[in-house]
Amino acid sequence: MNTPKPSILIIDDDESIRKVLTEILTGEGYNVESAATGKEATEKAEAKLFNIALIDIKLPDTTGVNLLTKIKETKPKMRKIIITGYPSLQNAVEALNKGADAYIMKPLNMDKILATVKEQLQKQIEEQEMTEKQLIQYIETRAKQIELHKENKP
């Protein structure tokens, strides 16, 4: 059975960064789409399921943190990685508090990006497996409760 390739949405107003990231991530076997604005990113995220969004902190029509909040509301399982050229502890803390799963500094180190993407995909898989285990456990518990209820009825 073929496992679908993970999908990544790159959100950055710098066309050269979008192109380089698209080329490298596609070469690693990922399905990649990109957006230059928050509006375009929101439309793409609503139309398709992405495993990961790489979000620039500064976009022409919004901030990465605002976009992060918006995406988190509609796509809570999508992993969100903030990319910034503004090395500030305040930016990092704010992004993480608003739901970023990771934070990468520019200039971009491709090894760091690939490692972070793989790490976030693994966490996504682990969360999905945990959710499935919890669901199975709930169903088994409910089945036992129903069975006990039937046995105790006259």
Residue ranges and their predicted role:
Residues 37, 63-66:
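Acidic catalytic/metal-coordinating carboxylates
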Residues 56:
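Active-site residues of response regulator receiver
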Residues 123-154:
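CheY-like receiver
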Residues 43, 65-77:
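Short amphipathic alpha-helix used as the core "switch/output" element in two-component signaling
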Residues 108-117:
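C-terminal output helix
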Residues 18, 60, 84:
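The feature encodes the CheY-like receiver
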Residues 15-33, 120:
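Two-component/phosphorelay signaling modules centered on CheY-like receiver
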